[in-house]
Amino acid sequence: MPVIPALGEAKGEVLPPGDTTTIIPLNWMLKSPPGHFGLLLLLSQQAKNGVMVLAGVTDPEYQDEISLLLHNEGHLKEVKMEGARLGLPGRAESLEHQVQSHLNMIAQSQRTFQKKDAGKAIILSKLTQEQKTKHCMFSLH
């Protein structure tokens, strides 16, 4: 199984139990090209312990040190983050590419749906391009 490169590693931080939030600095900066964004994710090991990223998206204008805002939903135990791989990079694709990809998926779904049930397809075909784009933008957040 390939090892996913991490952008940072926890240095002994502990997330106390009971809906607590901690900021973990990663000691690096990210410069995204225009129209791109950074997506910081945790591995499933942390998710199984009830840890989640509260703010994991960086925009191209943000130029300061990256930190992860982690939240421990686990009410029964503290989570030791030492050595945990943090800040895994997401796919570096432009926002425009993501929107176009979603629009293509909607168009394909619409064509498939029209073949299966022509009566209900009228509802989908009434969506304007603006509504489709708004739906896609919402699904990216």
From Swiss-Prot:
Which InterPro entries does the record cross-reference, listed alphabetically?
dUTPase-like_sf
Q: Write one Gene Ontology MF term.
A: magnesium ion binding
For the biological process aspect of GO, one term held by this record is: dUMP biosynthetic process
- This protein's source sits in the domain of life called Eukaryota
Hey, which family's this protein in? Belongs to the dUTPase family.
Instruction: Tell me the protein's name.
Output: Putative inactive deoxyuridine 5'-triphosphate nucleotidohydrolase-like protein FLJ16323
